[in-house]
Structure formats: structure tokens, C-alpha cells
């Protein structure tokens, strides 16, 4: 079944290239997320500029565009190595979307969706790690960074044959969060609650 893998890689990249943040903002009449808030076309920034409804729509779509190509390839018996490349292709599409001038998001939700087909137990642990980190720290970026660092160890525990491809995916996410890591180190990163509070104050004026 690995013969179909190259085609699945292309399909995954094209799926990832559909920027739901930009499309949802256009449909909802919201500012372009690439030019507003943090400038990142992802669910967290849409939450800041458009509220919960728009952000949830973006989050679900971003998860699905990582999940569906990998799940399809997994069902067809594609080997773990190729599954890893398919997952990375979906994230690359999200980060550098061919349909939107190669300016995309950071790939966290798409990566989460790509990992989900490995198992619901792993999915639950990953989601719990991200949520707990965000609740304790207030930093969405830190939640993504911690989850990416721990993901290979979780996968090794649940299904070790997928450790290498998930490690590749984690490296991509960490590289994409390079600027966030620097801001966290310098204590210059803004907490998500602070930005939401500012938005509410602005809306009430």
C-alpha cells in the first residue's frame, strides 16, 4: 500500500493548505487574521479577534484536515514511516498554504488531528496536557510547546512503532514556535487571558 503514499502526501498538503482561519474570518466579516491580533491565522488568534464561535469552527476544521488524510492512509495500510510524512505534509500545508500565498499558521491543531488516528487514549492524554498547561500558565504557545516535547514519549508508551514520525512532527511544531520560545524566555509573551480581556474592553467601548 506504500505505492499510494506519494499521492496521499500531495493530498494531505493540499488539505492543509485550506486555511480555515482566513475563510471563517471572511465569511464572518472579521479582519484578516494574518493582519490582525498576533498575525497568526490559527484558532487562538481568531478567538482573540472574533470570539469563541469562530475560533471553534477554525479549530475543528484544522484538526480534521490533519486527521482525515492520515486516517485514510492508516486505513489503507500505509506504513508508519509514510504516515509520518503524510502528517508532516498536512502540517506543511497549514504552515505554508499554496492557496493563500504560503503564509499560514503554526500547525498545532493540524498536528493534533494527524496524531489522533493513532488512538483515542493518546488523543485524550495529548489534549489534557495542552489544556492543563494553558490553564496553569495562561500561555497557549506554552501548551503547544510542552505537548510537542512530550508527544514522542506518549506515543512510545502507547504505540512505539509511531515514535519516529511523531518525533518528526514535534520537531516541526517546535521550529515553528521559535519566536514564541524566545518571547517566553524573555517573559515578553502575552497571556491569552490578557488579550481576551483587552478585546472585551474594546468591544464594550
Curated annotation (Swiss-Prot):
Pfam families recorded: G3P_acyltransf (PF02660)
Summary of the function given for this chain in its UniProt record: Catalyzes the transfer of an acyl group from acyl-ACP to glycerol-3-phosphate (G3P) to form lysophosphatidic acid (LPA). This enzyme can also utilize acyl-CoA as fatty acyl donor, but not acyl-PO(4).
Domain of life per record: Bacteria
Name of the protein described by the UniProt record: Glycerol-3-phosphate acyltransferase
InterPro entries: G3P_acylTferase_PlsY
Catalytic reaction(s) noted: sn-glycerol 3-phosphate + an acyl-CoA = a 1-acyl-sn-glycero-3-phosphate + CoA; a fatty acyl-[ACP] + sn-glycerol 3-phosphate = a 1-acyl-sn-glycero-3-phosphate + holo-[ACP]
Top-level taxonomy: Bacteria, Pseudomonadati, Pseudomonadota, Gammaproteobacteria, Enterobacterales
Sequence similarity: Belongs to the PlsY family.
Presence of the UniProt keyword Transmembrane in the record: yes
Record HAMAP family: PlsY
Any one cellular-component term (Gene Ontology): plasma membrane
Subunit relationships: Probably interacts with PlsX.
Pathway this chain belongs to: Lipid metabolism; phospholipid metabolism
